[in-house]
Amino acid sequence: SNRSCRKSVRRLKISINYFAISSELIVILTIVSAISLDLLLPRKLKYIVALVSILGSLIAFVPIIFQYANYSSPEILFEGSYVIDKFSLILKGLFILVTYLTFLLSVNFVESDEYYQGEYYFLLLSSLLGALVVTSSRDLLTMFIGIELASTPMFLLSGWKKGDQKSNEGSIKFFLLGVLSASLILYGFSLLYGVTGKLVFSDIANTLIQSDLNQSPVTLLSAIL
């Protein structure tokens, strides 16, 4: 029996459409490259980190164009928790372009000798990755992970100027507000899961439609949170 189990495990193959998540993979590769180069390169070559970040965000936009041009039907991945459809592609393209423009507009200030902080690129790219995850999330857990991944780097970016009192104050306030918001969102998700017993959005919708739970005060409270 043990041998048969081992054989079945060996035969099990997980098929993943890597092209569908190529933008996310490119952003991850850019994040790793940016933080590695910032650690390894001397100060006079730190501008390479900015070039890699700008180029990576631009390359991540290319698969979006091809996917949108050749779109036929939604691509559902990871047991239904991740979806690639036209709406998510439009939002992903928008987020990537905004990040790309942000890099272009801020690169001179970030690279100035007056106040250089190389983690700027790492944090902004990490926030972009979280935004991409949110746009394709199809269940509560994936959406919450994406929200946290997108918002947590912003706490640090708001306090980017460590020597500035206003920057530190803004970072602390943003952090406290973010923690409170995350707690309320997670509590709302837990109520919704407790009522329906489902994580996937479509399953939650079907459960609410097929029952009288959509009139429940708990469901209303979870929607508000």
Task: State each model region's role.
Residues S1-L225:
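Alpha-helical transmembrane segments of multi-pass membrane proteins predominantly involved
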